[in-house]
Amino acid sequence: MLPAQAAPDANKLLFLPLVQKNYPPPPTVFGAETHSPSTSRIQQAVQANLYWLRYSTISWAAIEPVRTDPPTYHWETVDEAGLEAAARAGFKTILVVKHIPDWAQKKSGVTCGPIAQDSMDEFSQFVRALVQRYSPYPYYVRYWEFGNEPDVDPSLVPPDSVFGCWGDKKDKYYGGGYYADMLKWAYPPLKEASPDSSLIIGGLLLDCDPQDPPPGQATGCKPAKFFEGILNNQGANYFDVVAFHTYATYYQGSILDEDDPKWDSRGGQVSGKVNFLRQVMSDYGVNKPILMSEVALLCSEQDCVTPGASFLDSQADFVVSVNARAWGLGLLGSVWYTLEESSWRQSGLFIQATPKPGYHALVFMAKELQDATLGSEITQYNGLRGYEFHLPAKRVWILWSPDGVTGQQISLPSGVKAVYDKFGNPLTPVQNSLWVVHPTYIELAK
């Protein structure tokens, strides 16, 4: 996974990832965000066979708090040990760049907001220094995400919000054009410093579909026009990957994704947002890979203090279904938020040091599909969703009910070798028939 052209210091030890059979396995969509890539966290990510590791350790405000000439950068504020550990383990690290120093803010006091026009040159210098430092050995960062959910107006969040808050609700394109101006300053130095690096636009929140707003939506879903604003201002030449975020909700015992009224006309939270982004790109003659840089199943507000067994089981269902769907939709990756325990509505895959069922489901999925390639979507079972995956010695079907509640009895195809539940426990069909509601793996002869 480490770049072949990188040349470490001859006096230093180069840690390469374990490579089986003298060639690396094909990339998968599996990923997660971590707030601290500690030794234990890295081990958990390795066990889950993650490919992507997203990490928000870069704060321009912390690195360059004071404007000086020449610039003074405080790299000691960056968790370099964590970045090195992630590289040593072979992960593709997505490094999130955010937080604007006081002296560079377009809106005074708003750390999460846009950069002032007269500070873009300093930002460009910072990007060059950043990429020059963290793209070579021993960090090998190749994916740089600029901002986090920038399609939010600063009036809607605290000034130091984790949201990107580049939004402008008075603008036709909600501020996307000005974000494109920033990309024009960031992209050239990034590519000059590391030609094989990729610039990712900050993961878009995409609150709802502007072409089909749900009833009572006061904004008319205008924030989702942010992406079009980027393209309308010729921003397509200044980024490599589109990123978006999506959070399904556990509601009254079921998974609210496909039926979410904000995106149901396009197929739900995941499929709908992907469909929307691809349509907007098509309208502008653009074709870029898409990354789901945050995703999770959230508990409902009243169930968040102590999540029940039903929520935890549904979350495990969603881990499998959303990764299968991301793979089937051709996404670059699917990054779960977060690997460790999260204060955000029980989204994390651990409770302190104890793995949730969702983590166990991810571990089995990664093991079952190791070295797999995508086959075709499975559509013959009305009411179920599924995909076929190809491996050297077998085919694997994954089937599930989209709401996690409404199941269906199916007749199995010929050539079935084994059937497993989402955790890898064997299931026994009865007279070649099987009840499917939760994610189910069906192994078939090649």
Regions found by a protein language model. Give the residues of each.
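Conserved functional hotspot residues at active sites or interaction interfaces
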Residues: 17
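N-terminal substrate-binding region of glycoside hydrolase catalytic domains
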Residues: 23-146, 150-174, 204-206, 218, ...
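Conserved, mostly hydrophobic/aromatic
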Residues: 53, 86, 130, 144, ...
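Noncatalytic carbohydrate-binding groove/subsite architecture in carbohydrate-active enzymes
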Residues: 174-319, 329
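Aromatic/acidic polysaccharide-binding cleft in carbohydrate-active enzymes
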Residues: 295-366, 377-382
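Carbohydrate-binding surface patches
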Residues: 380-415, 422-423
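C-terminal beta-strand-rich structural cap/linker in extracellular carbohydrate-active enzymes
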Residues: 427-446
